[in-house]
Amino acid sequence: MDYSEHPPPPALDGLVKARWTLAGGGAPGDWIEQQAVPDGCVEIIRRRAGRSRWNGDQPAAFAVGLIERPEGFGISGDARFEGLRIWPWAWSLLSDIPLAALRGRWLPFAAAGIEERLAAARALAATGRIIVAAHSVEEMSRGTGMSPRTLQRWFAAHVGLPPRTYLRLLRFHKAFEQVPAQPSLADHAAASGFADQAHMARDFRALAGVPAKEARRAARGPFLT
């Protein structure tokens, strides 16, 4: 399996986390099983070839909502995908479907001019950059200028999760993405904002389904291979 991702253009920073591609790299009759872990994002996906399946066969164009546990999916060996990984607050710029209806599942979704529509939302992008960079709910509140209660309402409307729950997903996924290159899990836990290595271990078991040591070997982008 060949997976690669690229940062978004500056105009989309705060709304889009990454562009990515995925190819099975095998024959049409092959079937490749993977695990996706929570990353705090909504995925807008276009399959250019082959087949994919998660709780049933998927169409050529679909969106995947926030997940809060590892989810298994399969792709045929000849499958090829292009995806846009957006922060959840960007979803309302593209669809009237509530985020709650997309949580933990996929829905058929196709839209034209996605990046152009997102690029016009400069104020929302600025708020998004503050949210993503924050290390605590208090930092989110100070940076955005929202009171704690207003921030709670904003998250309910634009994310579908409480701020503290969402911050946990962001902290975990940052640690997950970087864990393959880490010689010391204890140092990695401290650098990633966990209270200690045991704290990181609990989140890896809950959100990746495997210990951090195993994830260090098997993590590839947002997947466990």
What are these regions (language model features)?
Residues F155, L167, F204-R205, R216:
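DNA major-groove recognition helix of helix-turn-helix
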Residues L167, R171-K174:
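Pre-recognition alpha-helix immediately N-terminal to the DNA-recognition helix
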Residues R171, F204, R220:
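Positions that flank functional sites
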